[in-house]
Amino acid sequence: MKFTIAFAGLLGVFLTPALADYSISVNDDGNSGGSGQQSVSVNNEHNVANVDNNNGWNSWNALWDYRTGFAVTRLFEKKSCIVHKMKKEAMPSLQALDALVKEKKLQGKGPGGPPPKSLRYSVNPNRVDNLDKFGKSIVAMCKGIPTYMAEEIQGANLISYSEKCISANILWILNISFCGGIAEN
């Protein structure tokens, strides 16, 4: 009996950090044209990362659901959500993001590594009828909010694309632009 209690205690000590949520906050005042604050939370248990950008009316939240392969950005100014498929080649893995958070490499002036990757999406003007196909986390974030699907714009289409875009620059990792659709309003 004593062995079982000791084993359970040790298991809890070692397992808790592996399943814990980690958060950091980053002040964005030093960037050109940027202000406000971003924070990132990693939830290993649910395979989800959440980025909050607090900048007054231009605030937004991004949620990356690694289990379903979808991401969503909730734009407070537009009172809407934009869902898109995660591009695994451009977005850091949950483990890599978790490591950056734990090591606090995202604080200060950035990790000092390569420039952030950029993704550009075209927003479909038609609302998404059923959020369930995107997973519980996205449903919880966007239920009751107009939600739109976005498709990545690739290659030569990027050069000739002239529609208005909304940017969501995520720390010093990824620059995402949502173009057309609700960005035009």
Curated annotation (Swiss-Prot):
Disulfide topology: C81-C142
Matches recorded under PROSITE patterns: BRICHOS (PS50869)
Positions of the BRICHOS domain: 54-150
Gene3D superfamilies (UniProt xref): 3.30.390.150
Signal peptide: 1-20
A single Gene Ontology CC term: Golgi apparatus
SMART domains membership: BRICHOS (SM01039)
Keyword Cytoplasm among record annotations: no
InterPro entries named in the record: BRICHOS_dom (IPR007084), Gastrokine (IPR051772)
A Pfam family of this chain: BRICHOS
Name of the featured protein: Gastrokine-1
